[in-house]
Every structure is written in C-alpha cells, then in structure tokens.
C-alpha cells in the first residue's frame, strides 16, 4: 500500500477486478509487469435450452473455464469449447500468477422472431475438483455447498450472475506458463520442447495387483483393468511399467496392447489415448513388460479431463485362454501428473453455472476480466520495463483480515449481477482508508471495518498480534530482510511507500541501546497477545533483552526471556520462529537469532518471552511482536543451562558476556534497563559486575520486594567450573534475599519517619491504609492496567461525601404505587382478580402464566405465591361470560315471557361452550339445542298431577253475527 494514497489497492483489485491489477504485497519480490486480460464469449444455446459453464476462478493460466451443452433429451453433456483469455499468455510470458478475476454471465440477445427471453441460472462454488462433483444437473447444483455466500439459485438469465475470485491462499509462487523453449535449426519439422508446469504437480499413480488379468471377450476388444477419477486441464506426462507373464508358452507371437484413455466429462470418447504395446514370444512369456513413456502437451487437452481408463487387448484368438498374471518382474503401475495441479486455483475450487429452459439459438454472453503479475520471456523483456513487488504488510494483512470476515461482510464468490453492482460502492469505501464508511453503516458493517482498520492500518507494530489468530502463521513477515548493523542484528520491515514500520528489535548484546522509556514500553507491550501458562519446567534460566524501535530512536525498555527444554515454536510469534544450533549440531534452540558458538547437550530448547512466574512454579509466557533474541546475554544463559543447571530455575536474571577463559563474566551496557525489567518480576540482576550482585539505583521501593514463595534454586555442580563466582552467587543470593530486603525495608521506613515532609508523611499513611485494608494486590493490578492513572484519577478526584437523605417517596409508598401499576396492567390483560392487594401478597409481581391460566379455566381466584405450573399447558375451556350463556339458553329454550330454561338445559349449553373453547354453538350445535329444548318441553307430567279441565266455550247462535243485533228474527 503506497503512502501517497490511503487506499488498499490489492484488496480493491480483488473486490473490483475491472479497476485493474495491483501487485500482491507479499514477500515474493520478483520483477514483473501488471497486465489485465479480458475474456468475451457469445455462447449459442442448444436445442435443449440447457447447459453448464465450468469456471476456474483461480486458475493462473489462460484457460479460465469451459462450456458444455445438454443434448436434446438432457441425458448427456456435450463439450462445446474452452473459455480463455484474449491473449495466449504463454506466447509472450514465462511465469505468472493471478491477482484477481471476475466473470459476468447473462443473456440479452434475442433470436430472430422472438420478443422475450426465457431461462434461469443456478450457480455454486465447490471447494473440490470437477471430477468430485456427483451430479451436474440444474437442480442438484445447489447441493454442492451449504454456504449461502457461495451459491445463487433461479436467477433470470436477463439479470445475470457474477462470479468473483476470492484468494484461497497468499504467498503463492509464480507458475510456469508452459512456454516453448528456443530450438536449433537442425530440429525436424514439428519438433518442439516446452517448460512444463511442474512447480506443484498433482501426481496420480495406478498400482495394479499381482493377479490374473481379466479375460478378454475377443481379439481387438479392450478389456478394462482400471478406471477412476482424475483432473487434468493442462500438460501431463505418463510413465509406467506393466510386467506380466503367461501360464503357457504362446502358440504364436502375441501382441499385448495396454491402453490408457483420458476421458472428459461429457462422453466416453477419449480426449487423449496413450498405448504401450509389447510382443510376447516363447523367449519372454515368463517375464514380459509394457512400458509407458509419453508427454502430452496442453494443446492436446481439448477439454477438461475428469476420468481415466486403463485397458488391454490381444491380437491372437488362441491367446485368450492363455491367462496373463501381473507382477512378473515387480509391481505393475502407471503414473501420470497434472501440471500445476496442486497450486491453489488450478483444479480447485471451481464454480459451476447451469442454465435451463433458455430459448434455443439464443446467446449467452460471458464477459470476464483477469489481472496478472507476469514475467516476460527474454525477447519481450528487452523492450519492457519490469518492477519489483513491494512488501506491504498493512495492505496484505488488511486484505487478509477483511476476507477472513467474509461471512460477516457478506463477500460472496457468486453474486446476482445487480447485487454485485450495488455492492461496488461499499467495496470502494472498504478499500479507501479516508472514507467514513457511510454505505457500510447502512449495511451494518462500519463497526467491524473500523475495528479491522484500527488493527491493520496504523502501524505494523499494532498489526500482527491481533492478526495472528485470524491468518495463522502463513506469513514469514520479516523473511530475509535483515541488516546486521550490530552484534545483535536488527530486523526491519520495509513498506511499499519507503518508510519503516515499528518492529521491535530484541537486543541481548552489549551495544548501547538508549534510555529507558516508560511510554514506549506501555505502547508496545499493549500489543502482546496469546498468553499461555506452562507447568513448572524441569530446568531453565532467565536472561533479559532490551527492545528498541526504529520510530523512537534513543528510547528502549526491557523484558525477560526464559529458556526451557523441549520445542515450543507454536508459542512464539512468527518473527521469533527461528531455529539456531549449538556448535557441531549438538542441540538447537528456538527463538534465538544466531547460532551458539559452543557445544550443547544434544537437547532442544525454546527461548520464550516471560510474562509471570507463579507461586507453584508454573510460568506464563506470551507472544510479543519482536525479533528473536541475540547477543552475549543469551549465550551466557545457554551456557549456564547446558553446563551448570541440572534442575529448577534459578530465581535471578543473568546478563553479561563470557570472557575467553569461559569463567569470567564481562559487564555489558544496558544494565539499568535490564534491572528495571528484572525488578518488575521481583528478581535480582546477576552478572553486571564479576561476582557481585547488581547495584542499580531504583526509585521504587516496591520494585525491590520479592514475591512470596520460591522457585527451586539449583546449586551449581562443581562451582567455578565454568563461570567464576557462579556457585557462590546461586547459593547466597536466594538464601539471604529475604533478610536483606527486610533490613532494607526497615531502614527505608526509619529514614522516611525522620523526614519532616508532608508528602512523605502522606505516602506513609497511604501505604499503611492500603496494607491495613488488604488493597495492595488490587492497587498493584490497577496500576498495571492504568499506568498513567487516568481512570484512577477520575475515580478519586471527588472524595466521598456523607450519605444524603433519600429523595422522593419512601419504600412503602413506592411499593403501593408499583402494586397499583401492575394491577392496572393485569386487569387490562384479562386478569380481573389482580387487585393491588393481591399483587402485594404475590410479592409485588403480576400474575404468572400458571395463575392466569388457572383463573381462565376454573374461574376461581388463584392463591398468591402459587405458580400453578400444571395449568400452563392446559387449554382454556371455561366460558368467559355466564350471562351470555344464560341469555342464549333462555332464547333457545323459549320466548322471553315463557318460563326460564331448566338447569339441565343450562348445563347442556355450558358443555357446548366448553367444547368450543369458550365460543358459542355453531349451526349444527344450535339445531341440537333446539331439539333438546323441544324434548324437555314434551316431557310427560307426573301421574299425581291432575289435568285441569276447562269449561267448553258457548256455541254461537246460528243466526247471530257481530254485524246483526241479537233478537228473534228482528228486522234490520
């Protein structure tokens, strides 16, 4: 990433390949050119309207895919053509590697006489090879993957699909493009030689058993010996030797033809056939051999190969009964290789795009763009300017971290074209460090991208600790970029813009490093990561290192390194994963950046950054972003570990340089910085003066206090054998440490009391108050987390005040208000029983689900405090309105002025409501209730009940009417 532009150019080229190529910012710095190649095809749809596109999105060469058509009955595939870049790259370039690639697949051309396009597209990215796909039908394509970012289904052909290549790895090598080599003038016509693509070939080997060959059906008819899957898209070489013998001497000379056929995806017609023939006679029938030796160039691979078949045939009818047995002179086998087959992207992954029900003779357009890093051939190189690749850890690891979150950021390998076009704006924002990410905010990604930027973008020293868990140890970040400008060596990381990033140097030498900087220590130690606690080692030794950075000249700070047996390279940062050897290969050490000039004890050790020593002897180590330790102190510590320490870890830190007599320790520089690092762990520094403990002034009394407990201290076996005074130091320092420090503490306190200084008096009071209230450990941990006392200053800036009287209502009033509020909400929800008094008895809680169901089912008020869990899953069967039931019963039974319905009829209506879950009767139930009412009304009266007789009405006179007055035939 260039410093002149705040843009992640490599990531932009991956996301938006049409914007052009950008150099891969890894540590492969070959001179190369950048080139963009296009691919454009108008594929005609067959009569079946269905077909298949096989895409190789990561292939580093010119072949980017293939097109197949289904036959009219859609029972078999038919190969149509390769899909390639517009220029055959191997004609002008020797090596290359792919940067990015994209395909757009859609249809927009109407055949004559049509006014609308039909058809849909299915697409899926498969992590395996083409031969591993079980079914290639349109509907089964979606079962290739369960990842939603890797498939699209039922997209209209007019809308289109976009296939985007996402890297499957980094630090990929340049691949030979199978260019032809120059040849002499006497070469015969047609003869040529090429450099095969064999950096990482995929090799296949057919091993045949030492058994009888299957019997052939007739002469000239091949009989299959073996068939299986194999993926080949470019040149291959076949070698092999099939040895066999016959049971009896052949009557006539018999020719055995062993045939190796390379088959495609569509049919059983061989793409390439390799045949090896041998003549079996009476002289060699007990040990005949057929040898394969043939090279097949890429031009002969006319379509993708997915299968191979090995068969044999005879030319003599009489030889059919004379059985042949394999393995007469050794194992029978045939092998062949697929050039570049194991390079990521060549054979896997693949993307399959199937189309269906398209109009015959319509055109399916494939438009692709591929970006490459290419190395020209010698002729072209004379007239073309090439440039070195730039190692840009920020740009590379920003791309890695973004792609490692592709699920959260919804970065797909297969897109609906309109969705990809909508997403291009967000991609441009992600690759622009100056953008405030407004579009990403709308998608909900801004916080994630900002977090990645904070880790990846500021400086290299803050990048790798956070990135390591995401991208692993794939990058050997520093590589061979080493400048040895001192005894310790210095590792530098150079960015594309020409500036150096902060990479901590680990000094264990006597060179002048600089003055102690607390600010630098705080800033860089905050990047440490991945702490691991190890059980108490069998033995070990501790030595200090001094760290510096290029961006802060003259500043330094120290840390400790513990060397223990066994190999633990996985506990080291990738920058420190360096293996050094003792003299004459008598042992090795991980984490030391230079070979050891003396012999070891044939053991392997590891130098680990020390975080903490536990009371039980366990050690806590951590990963730090720094180079491996070097210099005299590391050699001194290793000499002690190999020759003088048999068990345990001495509770002290060793520094110095071994003199030529291998006994005296020569003082070295940087002792004050190393002493501070040792005191932070409560350990003394040994070796700054011959035979005398360090005498370094320190302003902090607490830094001299040694933690409780003790690690086992090994007494030197044969004192003064290697280093003078070592045995005396190791015996006396640890044993007299506690008494000496107690005297030092008492003397310091006595001197402090004599000083009439208010500040000292306050400090003493503060120490006493801290110890009295058992706050020492808490304050110490706080000081490590808040070294500048920013948070603590805010916390204690306002002293505590007397408790004020609470404002507002008292507790009883507040609870009553709470009960009233809950009661109102419960009544609104249908719990009429939930009065404020009931809520108070229910511990000021509303009705539980069980209590509410109990009331709805039984109609009774639940007891406060009981949960009625048995009623939670019961259905509500009790009718909620008894007045409604009574009115309905009276209405069905009779008119309002008649007598009310009997209790039996009420019960029948209640049962109907209960059966309906509280709802009224339906039409059939209503008719049943009417029939029941009529039956109840017709019930016979008891026998003792007399039927009341009524007086019959008086009969009217025959001549009277209401229009004539009564009388004896009077006239009107």
UniProtKB/Swiss-Prot annotation:
A divalent metal cation binds at residue 26. Its EC number is 3.4.21.-. InterPro entries: Birna_VP2 (IPR002662), Birna_VP3 (IPR002663), Birna_VP3_dom1 (IPR043048), Birna_VP3_dom2 (IPR043049), Birna_VP4_Prtase_dom (IPR025775), Viral_coat (IPR029053). Keywords: Capsid protein, Host cytoplasm, Hydrolase, Metal-binding, Protease, Serine protease, T=13 icosahedral capsid protein, Virion. The active site is at 633 (nucleophile), 674. Residues 797-817, 917-972 are annotated as: Disordered. The record marks 442-443, 486-487, 495-496, 508-509, 734-735 as: Cleavage. It holds the Pfam family Birna_VP4. This is Structural polyprotein. It comes from Infectious pancreatic necrosis virus (strain Jasper) (IPNV).
């Amino acid at each position: 990433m260039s410093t002149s532009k705040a843009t992640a150019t490599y990531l932009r080229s991956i996301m938006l390949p049409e914007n052009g190529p950008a150099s891969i910012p890894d540590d492969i710095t070959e001179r190369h050119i950048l080139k963009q190649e296009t691919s454009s095809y108008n594929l005609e749809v067959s009569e079946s309207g269905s077909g298949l596109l096989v895409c190789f999105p990561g292939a580093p060469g010119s072949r980017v895919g293939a097109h197949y058509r289904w036959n009219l009955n859609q029972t078999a595939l038919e190969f149509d053509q390769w899909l390639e870049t517009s220029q055959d790259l191997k004609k002008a370039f020797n090596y290359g590697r792919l940067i990015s690639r994209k395909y757009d697949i859609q249809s927009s051309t109407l055949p004559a006489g049509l006014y609308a396009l039909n058809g849909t597209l299915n697409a899926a990215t498969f992590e395996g090879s083409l031969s591993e796909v079980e079914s290639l039908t349109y509907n089964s394509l979606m079962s290739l993957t369960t990842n939603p970012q890797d498939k699209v289904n039922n997209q209209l052909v007019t809308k289109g699909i976009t296939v985007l290549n996402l890297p499957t790895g980094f630090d990929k090598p340049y691949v030979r493009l199978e260019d032809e080599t120059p040849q002499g003038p006497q070469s015969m016509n047609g003869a040529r030689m090429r450099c095969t693509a064999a950096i990482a070939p995929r090799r296949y080997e057919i091993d045949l058993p030492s058994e009888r060959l299957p019997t052939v059906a007739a002469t000239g008819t091949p009989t299959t010996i073996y068939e299986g899957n194999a993926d080949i898209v470019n040149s291959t070489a076949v070698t092999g030797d099939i040895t066999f013998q016959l049971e009896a001497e052949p009557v006539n000379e018999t020719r055995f033809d062993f045939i190796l056929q390379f088959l495609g995806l569509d049919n059983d017609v061989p793409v390439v056939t390799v045949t090896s023939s041998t003549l079996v006679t009476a002289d060699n029938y007990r040990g005949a051999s057929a040898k394969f030796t043939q090279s097949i160039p890429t031009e002969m691979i006319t379509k993708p190969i997915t299968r191979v078949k090995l068969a044999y045939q005879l030319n003599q009818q009489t030889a059919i009964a004379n059985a042949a047995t394999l393995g007469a002179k050794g194992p029978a086998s045939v092998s062949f290789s697929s050039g570049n087959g194991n390079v990521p992207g060549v054979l896997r992954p693949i993307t399959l795009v199937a189309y269906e029900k398209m109009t015959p003779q319509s055109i399916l357009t494939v438009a692709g763009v591929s970006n490459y890093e290419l190395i020209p051939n010698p002729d072209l190189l004379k007239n073309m300017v090439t440039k070195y690749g730039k190692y840009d850890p920020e740009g590379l690891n920003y791309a890695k971290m973004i792609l490692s979150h592709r699920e959260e950021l919804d970065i797909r390998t297969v897109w609906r074209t309109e969705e990809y076009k909508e997403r291009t704006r967000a991609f441009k924002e992600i690759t622009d460090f100056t953008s405030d990410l407004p579009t990403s905010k709308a998608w909900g990604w801004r916080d994630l991208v900002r977090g990645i930027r904070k880790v990846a973008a500021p400086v290299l020293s803050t990048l790798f600790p956070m990135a390591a868990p995401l991208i692993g140890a794939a990058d050997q970040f520093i590589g061979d970029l080493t400048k040895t400008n001192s005894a310790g060596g210095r590792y530098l990381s150079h960015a594309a813009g020409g500036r150096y990033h902060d990479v901590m140097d680990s000094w264990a030498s006597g060179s002048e490093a600089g003055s102690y900087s607390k600010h630098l220590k705080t800033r860089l130690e905050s990047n440490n990561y991945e702490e691991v606690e190890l059980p108490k080692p069998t033995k070990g030794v501790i030595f200090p290192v001094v760290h510096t950075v290029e961006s802060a000249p003259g500043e330094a700070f120290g840390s400790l390194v513990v060397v223990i047996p066994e190999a633990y390279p996985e506990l080291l940062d990738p920058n420190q994963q360096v293996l050094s050897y003792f003299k004459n290969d008598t042992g090795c050490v991980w984490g030391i950046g230079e070979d050891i000039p003396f012999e070891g004890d044939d053991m392997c050790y590891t130098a680990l950054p020390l975080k903490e020593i536990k009371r039980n002897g366990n050690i806590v180590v951590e990963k730090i972003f720094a180079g491996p330790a070097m210099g005299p102190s590391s050699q001194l510590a290793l000499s002690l570990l190999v020759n003088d320490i048999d068990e345990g870890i001495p509770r002290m830190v060793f520094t110095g340089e071994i003199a030529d007599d291998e006994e005296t320790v020569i003082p070295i520089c940087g002792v004050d910085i190393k002493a501070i690092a040792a005191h932070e762990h409560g350990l003394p520094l040994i070796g700054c003066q011959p035979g005398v403990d360090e005498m370094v002034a320190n302003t902090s009394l607490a830094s001299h206090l040694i933690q409780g407990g003790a690690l086992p201290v090994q007494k030197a076996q044969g004192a003064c054998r290697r280093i003078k005074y070592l045995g005396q130091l190791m015996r006396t320092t640890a044993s007299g440490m506690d008494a000496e420090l107690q005297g030092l503490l008492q003397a310091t306190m006595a001197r402090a009391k004599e000083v009439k200084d208010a500040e000292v008096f306050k400090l003493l009071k503060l120490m006493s108050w801290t110890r009295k209230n058992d706050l020492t450990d808490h304050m110490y941990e706080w000081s490590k987390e808040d070294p500048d006392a920013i948070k603590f200053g805010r916390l204690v800036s306002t002293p505590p005040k007397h408790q004020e009287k609470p404002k507002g209502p008292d507790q009883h009033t507040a609870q009553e208000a709470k009960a009233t509020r809950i009661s109102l909400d419960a009544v609104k929800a249908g719990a009429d029983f939930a009065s404020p008094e009931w809520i108070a008895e229910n511990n000021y809680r509303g009705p539980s689900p069980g209590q509410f169901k109990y009331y709805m089912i039984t109609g009774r008020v639940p007891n406060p405090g009981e949960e009625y869990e048995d009623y939670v899953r019961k259905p509500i069967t009790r009718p909620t309105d008894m007045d409604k039931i009574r009115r309905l019963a009276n209405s069905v039974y009779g008119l309002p002025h008649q007598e009310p319905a009997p209790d039996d009829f009420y019960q029948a209506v209640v049962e109907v409501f209960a059966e309906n879950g509280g709802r009224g009767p339906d039409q059939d139930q209503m008719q049943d209730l009417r029939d029941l009412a009529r039956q109840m009304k017709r019930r016979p009266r008891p026998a003792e009940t007399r039927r009341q007789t009524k007086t019959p009405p008086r009969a009217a006179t025959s001549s009277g009417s209401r229009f004539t007055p009564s009388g004896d035939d009077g006239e009107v």
